[in-house]
Amino acid sequence: LEIKKNGLYVDATFGEGGYSQAILDKGGKVLGIDLDAEQISNFKFHPASGGTNLSLVEGNFADIEKIAKENDFFPVNAVVFDLGLSMRQISQSGRGFSFKKLNEPLDMRMNTDTEMTAKYLLNHLSESELFDVFARNSEEINSQKIAHEIIIKRQFKKLETVDNLTNCIDRAIGEQDNNAYKRIFQALRIEVNQEFDNLKKGLTGSAKIIKDDGKIAVVTFHSLEDRIVKNFSKTQGIRLLIKKPIMKRSEKSFERSAKLRILGRKSHI
């Protein structure tokens, strides 16, 4: 992003502060936003960065334009989105984001002040509605079978914990399949947090607060997110500054799936 000293940068998915810290270390000023209050409260920035260059806001990046203007933080040099979960959310949040945390509740809320949970969806949606959630948010090939198995299971006992859901998936497809787990958990998390709608709003708001030569950097982790970013690049005078996404070679599967796209204004060539 070519960080400029005293330049303004919005870290729209603050997380554990990695992007913000890198920008601060190069002399930039950061407005960090995160929907998860625990992410902000747990952050410890390096003293050398100086606290005055970092402002943190608990909020939804769907409201990025409003948040930036309320904090008198615009126009900005760049906005950064990293759409993956943080390691803390996966391993320590206790909200059932990971299919490996078998005893955790099926919560999956980024913002625990909201009411909608994965547990509610699994125990109240109809079979056709569950199928729609799974197919639309993950394109899981066994969505219909899994939705049907959930309906059968909950007639006898509500789905409460992660292992209740993974057991349903096992029975539906006849085997243990980590990829199926990942896709179904992804689909529920997206639905609970309205991630696709928020991303569209966040990109739209970002386009309104960047400078004429400003950039929007987005790291996605699956094709549905990436599709939203590519489609957005054809609207509102925005274009992809680099045609092909930047990808990282890594032994870690989640890093291999990451794609970085850089967007900017068409008028700035």
Predicted regions and their residues:
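S-adenosyl-L-methionine-dependent methyltransferase catalytic core, i.e., the SAM/SAH-binding region
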Residues: L1-H46, G51-I269
